[in-house]
Curated annotation (Swiss-Prot):
Subcellular localization(s) per the UniProt record: Cytoplasm
Subunit note: Heterotetramer of 2 PyrK and 2 PyrD type B subunits.
UniProt binding sites for substrate: 43, 69-73, 125, 193-194
Major location (coarse): cytoplasm
Protein species of origin: Methanopyrus kandleri (strain AV19 / DSM 6324 / JCM 9639 / NBRC 100938)
Cofactor binding note of this UniProt entry: Binds 1 FMN per subunit.
Protein name: Dihydroorotate dehydrogenase B (NAD(+)), catalytic subunit
Involved pathway(s): Pyrimidine metabolism; UMP biosynthesis via de novo pathway; orotate from (S)-dihydroorotate (NAD(+) route): step 1/1
PANTHER family referenced in this protein's UniProt entry, alphabetically: DIHYDROOROTATE DEHYDROGENASE (FUMARATE), DIHYDROOROTATE DEHYDROGENASE (QUINONE), MITOCHONDRIAL-RELATED
Enzyme Commission number(s): 1.3.1.14
GO BP annotations, alphabetical order: 'de novo' pyrimidine nucleobase biosynthetic process; 'de novo' UMP biosynthetic process
Length: 318
């Protein structure tokens, strides 16, 4: 499969390791690359180290099509993550993007400065549905807040910035938030974070299964929502920014769907617990060849003309 240019760097293929537990430290990043990831998005880092929510923090209902997680943004803080990235770079020549979260523009600015000259780019996490008051989706549903945060990070960082969007808003708000991020200097949009929060109850204890009570929904059930968000963003902003799709991707067919919807690249999280990134990349390459595409970039947005036409019939699109 042909390499792709994403966020200012050459990726061997369009499939990256999403921000999550696997990319919380150097050994996990190395594991992801050895299993074929073309790029790494680190576990989200906050200004100070966090222990996160009490366990359980992840519950697997993949036999029902989804998983729930409520990590609570556990991380070692920026000083330690900088060391983890630098040690990783000593061994691997693979793009690394730092995922960061704070409770306002000043915090994002400080984090951006901390990773300047270290990470190849930033991903601003303004979309976690269970991070706690003042963080995550609470910020990411407010276009004005997203604009201020993005501008602060862009000014302080020496590379490209992507804003990770929440699916927990209506279509109009989604597009307003995306426009605010782009106007403030974002070069990419990552879509989407987990959906929710959701709840499961243990029948034996009559208590929530997750330690935090509620958590974000990931896995295959998230994919139709993520695809729709990617397609909506591509219709409105595909000429202006790169779009990175994430949510429910398990195999090559899923990747090609996201490419068709307008994503330039994708991230894999939940499925990486059981399947190698390289296997998904190989499947993607075979499917693209079967469909007559020489590479992934030729497939980007293939479904958008018909998607636009069908939205017109609903009165949702010009």
């Amino acid at each position: 499969m042909r390499p792709v240019e994403v966020l200012g760097k050459r990726w061997a293929h369009p499939i990256a390791c999403a921000s999550g537990a696997l990319a919380a430290h150097r050994p996990g990043m190395e594991n992801a690359v050895l299993r074929g990831a073309a790029a790494i998005f680190t576990k989200t880092v906050t200004e100070s180290p966090r222990e996160g929510h009490p366990g359980p923090v992840f519950v697997d209902y993949l036999d029902e099509g989804y998983a729930l997680n409520a990590m609570g943004l556990p991380n070692p803080g920026p000083d330690r993550m900088v060391v983890e990235i630098e040690e990783f770079r000593d061994e691997f020549d693979v793009p690394v993007y730092a995922s960061v979260a704070a409770d306002g523009p000043e915090g994002f600015k400080r984090l951006a400065r901390a990773f300047s000259g270290v990470a190849d780019g930033l991903e601003l996490n303004v979309s976690c549905p269970h991070a706690g008051k003042g963080y995550g989706a609470e910020l990411g549903s407010d276009p004005e807040a997203v604009a201020e945060i993005t501008e602060a990070a862009v000014r302080a960082f020496d590379g490209p910035v992507s804003v990770k969007l929440t699916p927990n808003v209506d279509r109009e708000t989604l597009l307003e938030v995306a426009a605010a991020a782009i106007d403030a200097g974002a070069e990419a949009l990552t879509a989407v974070n987990t959906l929710g929060p959701g709840l499961r109850i243990d029948l034996r204890t009559a208590s929530p299964v997750l330690g935090a009570g509620v958590g974000g929904l990931s896995g295959p059930a998230l994919k139709p929502i993520a695809l729709r968000v990617v397609a909506d963003l591509a219709l409105e902003f595909g000429e202006e920014v790169e779009i990175i799709g994430v949510g429910g991707i398990r195999n090559g067919e899923d990747v090609v769907e996201f490419l068709f919807a307008g994503a330039k690249a994708v991230q894999v999280a939940t499925a990486a617990r059981e399947k190698d990134f390289g296997d998904i990349a190989m499947e993607t390459s075979h499917i693209l060849k079967e469909l007559g595409y020489d590479g992934p970039e030729e497939a980007i947005g293939a479904a958008l003309p018909e998607y636009r036409e069908r939205l017109r019939r609903l009165g949702w699109c010009q």
